């Protein structure tokens, strides 16, 4: 074999150059977690599908955790991608998978077990674990009273860890963990007497108790605890440091407190306020807006009294109302809906009524052509309240149960299931406060019945404002008991509630 005289020197130089190149390459630092997020332009977050964390309503994506983490993504200048976990164990499993979500935002409590699964941020919300029971049953007053009770909590939750610690001290305490339910399901089970007790955090109870009148707090189990976000343990500190800086900032500038007030502060509920109050508002408020209701309803081919009933349910005919969630005006329109309907000033009563009428007509027109009146009107009201996607989920549930998806009486039985994990986990649009549209439609029908009665031909126009107007069952000098309001019976063409 023949070799060129200069081969070995050249080979040596090549090897040296290659080695230096590899060494330099090894010295190049990998991008940090924060840098990767910014380069990808996406922040992947995993959460729970529940009222206190993340869900969709007629306004779109919402929830305390969602709004807080959405602001964080906006601060980073990236898109937010929300993923929902099947349960708490699944949440941590997904975070720890290669290429999984980089952030967990689901009202998480830092526990000894979870410290092995994730690293936690600064706190942003203080909550108290509470034992809840059904009103009318014997009230537990301390952990010893948990013996002999059927207790169910979320699988993998901090509450399950608390009960495990109690059981170590008092072996007679028994409890079950379930990954097939959410907090709302547990409260419903207590409310209906299916289980004796459960543990929930104070914020989630405050948000949901209005829907479960039989649920009561027995006692606080331990001291207040702090909710935090979580990042995978294998990541560097860059994202966690950025999160902590963000949480500190929103704490100082008041953003965090405003979110707390919106979701956990006192919420005014516009339910059935009583026939007496309604009669007073018929005289004092409706005459100012009656022509606007009639004009807009005629244009959109809607009964003006139905439109007025919607307006009363939404704002009690108050044009300057603004809710904590940002809906405004007599018809309580969202900013997006107002823009879509051509409303430039939501606080202008005429524009608000026009926008509400146009939007209701649009929603009604989107329904399946097979749906006939009067069910078409009631289902349109439900869609107006909860959103078309969730209504379709309820209709599909009705169909699967052998019920008629085109009948309000059947669909309204399915709507509350959208708040139960057993059912919403099978739907396209997920969790929704399904009980709300049922009450929304029921209230509007009550108001509509009264409006129909008082606006018979002999009571048209300005006579509605007559001081001698009488609503059946109402003594104008003595308001009726709010627990038993009397309203006219539904007319024959309207199906009974």
From Swiss-Prot:
<protein>
    <recommendedName>
        <fullName>Membrane-bound lytic murein transglycosylase F</fullName>
        <ecNumber>4.2.2.n1</ecNumber>
    </recommendedName>
</protein>
<dbReference type="InterPro" id="IPR008258">
    <property type="entry name" value="Transglycosylase_SLT_dom_1"/>
</dbReference>
<feature type="active site">
    <location>
        <position position="314"/>
    </location>
</feature>
<dbReference type="GO" id="GO:0009279">
    <property type="term" value="C:cell outer membrane"/>
</dbReference>
<dbReference type="GO" id="GO:0009253">
    <property type="term" value="P:peptidoglycan catabolic process"/>
</dbReference>
<comment type="function">
    <text>Murein-degrading enzyme that degrades murein glycan strands and insoluble, high-molecular weight murein sacculi, with the concomitant formation of a 1,6-anhydromuramoyl product. Lytic transglycosylases (LTs) play an integral role in the metabolism of the peptidoglycan (PG) sacculus. Their lytic action creates space within the PG sacculus to allow for its expansion as well as for the insertion of various structures such as secretion systems and flagella.</text>
</comment>
<feature type="compositionally biased region" description="Low complexity">
    <location>
        <begin position="486"/>
        <end position="497"/>
    </location>
</feature>
<keyword id="KW-0472">Membrane</keyword>
<dbReference type="GO" id="GO:0008933">
    <property type="term" value="F:peptidoglycan lytic transglycosylase activity"/>
</dbReference>
<comment type="similarity">
    <text>In the C-terminal section; belongs to the transglycosylase Slt family.</text>
</comment>
<keyword id="KW-0961">Cell wall biogenesis/degradation</keyword>
<keyword id="KW-0998">Cell outer membrane</keyword>
<dbReference type="InterPro" id="IPR000189">
    <property type="entry name" value="Transglyc_AS"/>
</dbReference>
<keyword id="KW-0732">Signal</keyword>
<comment type="similarity">
    <text>In the N-terminal section; belongs to the bacterial solute-binding protein 3 family.</text>
</comment>
<feature type="region of interest" description="Disordered">
    <location>
        <begin position="464"/>
        <end position="497"/>
    </location>
</feature>
<dbReference type="InterPro" id="IPR023346">
    <property type="entry name" value="Lysozyme-like_dom_sf"/>
</dbReference>
<feature type="signal peptide">
    <location>
        <begin position="1"/>
        <end position="29"/>
    </location>
</feature>
<feature type="region of interest" description="LT domain">
    <location>
        <begin position="268"/>
        <end position="497"/>
    </location>
</feature>
<feature type="region of interest" description="Non-LT domain">
    <location>
        <begin position="30"/>
        <end position="267"/>
    </location>
</feature>
<dbReference type="GO" id="GO:0071555">
    <property type="term" value="P:cell wall organization"/>
</dbReference>
<dbReference type="InterPro" id="IPR001638">
    <property type="entry name" value="Solute-binding_3/MltF_N"/>
</dbReference>
<dbReference type="Pfam" id="PF01464">
    <property type="entry name" value="SLT"/>
</dbReference>
<dbReference type="Pfam" id="PF00497">
    <property type="entry name" value="SBP_bac_3"/>
</dbReference>
<dbReference type="GO" id="GO:0016998">
    <property type="term" value="P:cell wall macromolecule catabolic process"/>
</dbReference>
<dbReference type="InterPro" id="IPR023703">
    <property type="entry name" value="MltF"/>
</dbReference>
<keyword id="KW-0456">Lyase</keyword>
